[in-house]
Amino acid sequence: MSKKILIIAAHPDDEVLGCFGAVARMVKEGDEAYTLILGEGKTSRDERRSVENKKAELNILNREIEKANSVINIKKIFIEHFPDNRFDSVDLLDIVKAILKVKEEIKPDIIFTHYENDLNIDHQITYQAVVTATRPMEDESVKEIYSFEVL
């Protein structure tokens, strides 16, 4: 029986570096996979941290996300725009709600996400938000959560 997989990554390319090998195999074996990218991925190194200043680069990055995910036949990509390397400036509940919205739409059986003790703050918060969004409830679809590290 095929399963639905949801990759939840803090930044563009974390999904590629973290779990694409495993997910590619699972898709090849008949499972369906989806990706949720939480952060915009560009502004942390910009002096003013302005999304407006990085608009052209962000558009290119979004096309690259689509291209990379199409390589392993990701069915749909969801992109949020939380501030790059500043998830700690966002209420955890806002990140949890973004995850819940996607989770409720696709009802995944399996989630791949960041390792809880990763050094990157966005990765830590992503893990925490995933665990919160998948807490044991009677109608919870997620049966397995796998963590990956991005080195």
Residue ranges and their predicted role:
Residues A98-E144:
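Active-site adenylate/phosphate-handling loop in enzymes that bind or generate adenylated species
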Residues M1-I106, R135-D139:
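Active-site rim/loop-helix segments in enzyme catalytic domains that contact anionic ligands
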